[in-house]
Curated annotation (Swiss-Prot):
Pathway: Porphyrin-containing compound metabolism; protoheme biosynthesis; protoheme from protoporphyrin-IX: step 1/1. SUPFAM superfamilies: Chelatase. It is an enzyme of class 4 (lyase). Catalyzes the ferrous insertion into protoporphyrin IX. Disulfide bonds: none annotated. Keywords: Cytoplasm, Heme biosynthesis, Iron, Lyase, Metal-binding, Porphyrin biosynthesis. The keyword Cytoplasm applies. It catalyses: heme b + 2 H(+) = protoporphyrin IX + Fe(2+). This is Ferrochelatase. GO terms for cellular component: cytoplasm. Its EC number is 4.98.1.1.
């Protein structure tokens, strides 16, 4: 919509207004698997004080002296294993773009809504897409961090970056931030349907189903982060929906980094122990990841599977994330429509 300029000076610029933006935001991705791309991405990620809460005086000598000189090669090789070579990008970027495009189609009944996507680290940046939505005439924006469970290191830092952008804007759009949806019925049903659909394709039945969530340091939880509790609730609701018992369903936590104690039980150690204890068949789902990415495709589908087989396990299944499938899009659409109420 363009403002009526009939009552304004002839040299007054046209102003676009009246649209509502929806900005889907995921964690981020390097632009490539080479050293330079990986180092640039890891530097932005690991200098975020929401992610690493250590004092910079303590952390930066380690980060710039060791981590950023060794991790880019290692992480780059891991990304190469799961890189979307057809589009020369990570699958997280592919899925997030697809989710944005599909969401726009699902909201076509709302002609004043514009949908876009961004990454907290890497490109496209949150600030650049807020600018783009503002240029489209969006004076209200729903900011949707794509994390079912809230954590300061994920949801909060997305919000921080958006608020930081607003600090530089003369005419700020109104901003709504989407809360966690860890216990949403549609979300739980989508997870359960995904488990049932995938397991129905196997000629064997798992003895144990692991729900593996990304971990956070235990100290963050002790300081009041609700993430652990929300993960446990998601796990409990999923277990109950699937009709499983505590003996054949377990919530675990993966991707720990550094010397601190993280949320437990650890996924990698649990997988290894199950195999050594004689469990022969397991399946793993990642309920906290909206889209498949390095942590699911490489860390679970590759590393965890290898560990299970190396320690005596026989059958391992990784259940894909909801990604841009119909069930996953139903979940995201429900959340977006709920948050748009009063604006459309």
């Amino acid at each position: 919509m363009t403002a009526d300029i009939s009552l304004r000076p002839a040299d007054h610029p046209a102003v676009r207004f009246g649209k509502v933006g929806v900005l889907l935001v995921n964690l981020g991705t390097p632009d490539g698997t080479d050293y330079t791309s990986m180092r640039r991405y890891l530097r932005e990620f690991l200098t975020d004080r929401r992610v690493i809460e250590w004092s910079p005086w303590k952390w930066y000598p380690i980060l710039f002296g060791i981590v950023l000189n060794t991790r880019p090669q290692k992480v780059g090789k891991a990304y190469e294993l799961i890189w979307n070579k057809e589009q020369n990008e990570s699958y997280l970027r592919t899925y997030t773009r697809n989710q944005s495009e599909l969401m726009a189609g699902r909201l076509k009944d709302l002609d004043n809504v514009k949908v876009d996507w961004a990454m907290r680290y890497g490109t496209p940046s949150i600030g650049s897409r807020i600018d783009a939505l503002k240029e489209e005439g969006c004076d209200r924006i729903v900011l949707f961090p794509l994390y079912p469970q809230y954590a300061a290191a994920t949801t909060a830092t997305v919000n921080d970056k958006a608020f930081q952008k607003l600090l530089s804007m003369r005419w700020q759009p109104a901003l709504r931030t989407v809360p966690a949806y860890h216990d949403d019925e549609t979300y739980i049903e989508a997870l359960a349907a995904s488990v049932e659909r995938h397991l129905s394709t196997l000629d064997w039945k798992p003895e144990m189903l692991l729900a593996s969530f990304h971990g956070i340091p235990m100290s963050y939880f002790k300081q009041g982060d609700p993430y652990y509790c929300q993960c446990q609730k998601t796990g409990r609701l999923l277990r109950e929906r699937l009709g499983l018992t505590k003996e054949n369903f377990l919530v675990t936590f993966q991707s720990r980094f550094g010397p601190e104690e993280w949320l437990q039980p650890y996924t990698d150690k649990t997988v290894e122990k199950l195999a050594k204890d004689g469990v022969k068949r397991i399946a793993v789902i990642n309920p906290g990841f909206v889209s498949d990415c390095l942590e699911t495709l490489e860390e679970i589908a590759e590393q965890a599977a290898h560990s299970f087989h190396e320690n005596g396990g026989e059958k391992f299944a990784h259940i894909p994330c909801l990604n841009d499938g119909e069930d996953g899009m139903k979940v995201l659409e429900k959340v977006v429509r709920r948050e748009l109420q009063g604006w459309v």
